[in-house]
Amino acid sequence: MLSPTQKRASLLASGAAVAGLLISSLAAGGVSYAADNESCRPDGLYKTPGVDVPYCSVYDTEGREKMGADHQRRVIGYFTSWRTGKNGQPAYLAKDIPWDKITHVNYAFGHVGGDNKLSVGADGPDNASTGMTWPGVAGAEMDPEFPYKGHFNQLNKFKKQHPNVRTLISVGGWAETGGYFDDNGDRVNSGGFYSMATNADGSVNQAGIDTFANSAVDFIRKYGFNGVDIDYEYPTTMKDAGNPLDWQVANARRAGLVKGYAALMKSLREKLDRAGAADGRHYLLTVAAPSSGYLLRGMETFQVQKYLDYVNIMSYDLHGAWNEYVGPNASLFDDGKDGELAAANVYGSAQYGNIGYLNTDWAYHYFRGSMPSGRINIGLPYYTRGHKNVQGGTDGLWGKAAATSCPAGAGLTKCGDGAVGIDNLWHDKDTNGQESPAGSNPMWHAKNLEKGIVGDYVTQYGFPANTTLTGTYARKYDSTLVAPWLWNAQKKVFLSTEDEQSVAAKADYVVDRGIGGTMIWELAGDYGWNAAKGQYEMGDTLTSLMYDKFKAATPYGAKKSNKALPTQAVNVGVEFTEFKLGDSNYPITPKIKITNNTATALPGGTEFQFDYGTSAPSNASDQSGFGTKVISSDHTGSNVGGLKGDFHRVSLKLPAWQSLAPGASVDLAFNYYLPVSTPSNWTVNINGTTYALAGDLARGTTTVEPGTTTPPTTPPTTEPTTPPTTPPTTPPTTPPTTPPTGCTAPAYVAGQVYNGGSLVSHKGHTWKAQWWTQNEEPGTTGEWGVWKDQGAC
């Protein structure tokens, strides 16, 4: 049985398959309206139509998250449910979290139940989340204010002491994406995310999604969470991706997984927004996203990013014992020597631009193409991965270690030779109940190995008290990769690690590039020195280091574009469609569908421009006569030591003979070679005037009809940000010539249209419209309605 601890485990099928470009939809957005909460909305974040989302409860007026004066960047820690200490192994409880050093806690994990509802299992004294207690453990006393016990009681107890820290319920993970563990610890292969979001025929299971999303709202309200983190591993079209136990249900649905994922995230965003408006607090929606170019190749352009407050990149598990290629678990940069990529001739194939895609920097730039840097967090592993019997390489790095067989249930016919025994303390078990070779250890154990120390905890993991170490675990470090490792030359064991040097470099990288922060899997892996015992144990050394790096940092980047864009936008929709599936998705020529949702014809020769991320080389082209070309690039050449900039700027034009009438669409075929997320920062030049596109959801833009400065006379056809309402066919009542005595704003007139930001006087008060409105009397719409009371006048 695969245990719950096999969370973000091997990518298994990540292999050396070369990724192809995947680009997805940029649907036309709606009119932007001036409103107090709108001033706090993060750039590019989708807003639920008709809802005054209380963004200002979480974000400042620049759209940056408010986390406390000494937290300029995020430090997000995953806190796992299973390290309770009840099995005799070291416990990691809520009291052990360095609450003053972090900004968010993601609780791992909730799951999708057989009824499609969010669950952590049945209540009871053995339920770690809601029922367990720790009598006699100092700091783990239950808070009687809460009607539940367990970790949830403890998390809320400490949140009262640290009100700036936000908690999210993380749902899924490696072991519970396609099923869940019942109260007996047996896995139920229910289908999980796969069947909840996608029907067997590949269509969207909206009923299942609605059930889950409604239950998620109920769950966070009941247990005091600040949001939901979706850890769906993985909604990709790549065959045999994810947990082998899920392949039967997942593979049958591959063609519809991306669409189901998008529907799930949109529904969650909208239901959380409505709940937040009712509760007066903005609820966060985040995901744990893959970093592998192989997996992302099957996820189109990760078009769900617009629904997310931020994305946490799982920028680890980039190398491990699922194959023979020995390399870092989570290198920051490429060095041009990655054994897995070299075997696939990635470096030798011109179309890939000499770009290596198994590193944190590549993954960051993939998401940077569609999101502000501040809505991205890079992942750091507080655990090791490694091989034994390594042949070749430099101190094991870029060597090979092939196994003669694979663990039961791995679903593979060829595997790497993973480290075992004392080099695999945090191992999972295969489906036969045997140790799964992986070289998986908490960093506190790896530090003891490095120092030649056998910690007294080894007996709690089944080792005898007189255990001795064989050979020396020499620390090695590659400054180009920003990657440390331990090399035992006698045992030929390679263990990829993290320590102060690598974490400091990654923290500097975050600060220098305006990135939102870091995400940690998992908090219990951090280390501290116990001088009394002469050994490393669970601690907060690395987390404290990041806190110190971030506390005085400059504010993170809050804008998608690095250049000024037009403040007027038009409703021209751009959608990316017709992706091939799985391994057929390379090379890729998706169709780009441009739809004119304005009332003005777009003449032949109309130019569109957009940015795509430097995760792909600057060789974009089209096959439809639109003259697509890259007109500027922030990066060229290899990415050894990191990509040097964020975007490639692309130009394409309607053919001179082809105009685009109102309501009409045109398709063109694109060609790319490495994955990018949804292209952004679109502009269109119509009759000499350059506009933004409403679908980019940029802050500070107003949607207008081309050639005017006024909003369209009819609502947009896709994703309006306000309720669609047709203006009256008869003139409104003529307003009074003077407002009521003492009031300076015009008097409210029933039937008149008011745009967001409009001020009126009514019944002795001044009122401000939060969005477009008509026939809604001030004072009757409630606290979260369209009219906000500005005080007596």
Model-derived features: positions:
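Short, solvent-exposed loop/turn segments enriched in Ser/Thr/Gly
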Residues: 584-592, 604, 666, 752
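Extracellular low-complexity, Gly/Ser/Thr-rich intrinsically disordered linkers
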Residues: 83-84, 439-440, 444-555, 576-577, ...
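Terminal connector regions
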Residues: 645-648, 653-707
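Secretory targeting and sorting signals
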Residues: 1-34, 713, 717-721, 725-729, ...
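Tryptophan-rich substrate-binding surfaces of secreted polymer-degrading and adhesive proteins
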Residues: 705-715, 719-793
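Glycan-recognition patch characteristic of GH18 chitinases/ENGases
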Residues: 35-220, 410, 414-448, 456, ...
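Substrate-binding surface in catalytic domains of secreted glycosidases
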Residues: 117-142, 235-435
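Asparagine-centered strand-capping/turn motif at beta-strand->loop junctions
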Residues: 593-601, 612-614
